[in-house]
Amino acid sequence: KMMIDSVHKQNAHIMISIWASFGPQTQQYAKLKEKGLLFDFETWPQSGLSHIWPPRMDYPSGVKVYDAFSPVARQIYWDHLKKLFDYGMDAWWMDSTDPDFFNAKKEHYEQKGAMGSWRSVRNLFPLATVKGIYEKQRKASEEKRVFIMTRSAFAGQQHYGSGLWSGDVASTWDMLRKQVPAGLNYTMTGCPNFNTDIGGFFCGSYNTNGAGSAPRNKQYQELYVRWMQYGLFCPVFRSHGADAPREIYQFGKKGEPVYDAIEKTIRLRYRLLPYLYSTAWQVTSQGESYLRALHYDFASDRRTWDMADEFMFGRSILATPILNPQYTEEKIFREDAMSGWEKKELKDEKIKELNADFTEEKTVTKYLPKGADWFDFNTETLYRGGRDVTIPSALDRTAMFVKAGSILPLAPVMQYATEKQWDNLDIVIYPGCNATFLLYEDEGDNYNYERGAYSTIEMKWDNKKRTLTIDSRKGNFPGMMTNRRFNIRLAGTEDVKTVNYNGTAINVSM
């Protein structure tokens, strides 16, 4: 509890990794075994001596997966997590929700659980175990929203406070490129929450100057920055992995290109929080998605039908992440897929110590979908849609565009999400056609919003009249601001109009 409290005092949250399997020395195992609620097949870790692959089976771990389809088993599982929740644990990292299933035999598939044979229910396992934790936490308290990150999912899992991450992926450009279609394909199943390990999980082959030195390797630095810029557009923005630490100061110091690029990306993410949180409300209330394949919104543009390197982030932002190296040589990576967890990264001739100059100006060519005009977010240059454009791509520049006919709310620079109230938001209007935006706010935690404790402010841009209408605020919630300021600006101009807003509708001519 002291550890959790110390994290909270630093204005951070804490998430713990929990698994759906138990070793024979644990209380959970004993209770589950007594009631016949363990599946009898090999799962991770197989060895009781080491995680090194292949496992040493002279001392098997005996770890077994619990029957998540049984209400009794789910209660036993939660009973041993409840104490952690009472201590203040904020979130659950539910790993191996597939679950890991090694050396499968016919009899393993035919064994019976609470809902039938393992063969008939295996794909449902992540849904069942995630749902169990969600329901137990909701019953325990309505004051903290359930947040679950899980390695696997099934249809409908979005109902239970869960998001999927793409697993322990390799730290390569090829793997970064694959994250984009992976996320889009996943979210098209109706599950909107997808994220990845920024920088990839296995970065060991970049440790060319000793253990943990990858953050000082030029090849890894460039990959990490570009991966972070892609991660900016995921619902969860998260750096994680093995083999080397990932804190910003591991990559250099303030004033150096890599450090500054990472800091700039993080600060932009926090500035986008009003847009992201309002999008989250559309996801929750209207069934929308954070990550939108381009054919959702531009179906008449055939070029978007199979585009796997660009997407919409919400309704207004076109994400065009840079997915190829521009300053260093691409690491060519080959592996035996069954080589084992700890051997996913192998040294090869492409890993080098390079003296890349990250201050050099670079350019990149991106496609702008037909059916809209687009503003470069960084320069606010306006481009016609339906063509390729070449834009600057310095290391610290996240490649992104905003659709003409958009309203983008931006928060002040913050160190953490609740450091400052949103009482002084910047509102950037991207003209060219009419636009609307619904600003959503609530208490930031708990489930009172399900009972109507939230507010919305609709903003409407009339492109012909050059007027922004900020409608009357609808709804209320405890702690809601009654007075605030909006700093309004047209993209491509520097003139700012600041207005005071007390919840009553106002018109602002630009």
Feature-to-residue mapping (PLM):
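Accessory, solvent-exposed terminal regions and/or long lumenal/extracellular loops of proteins
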Residues: E349, L395-T504
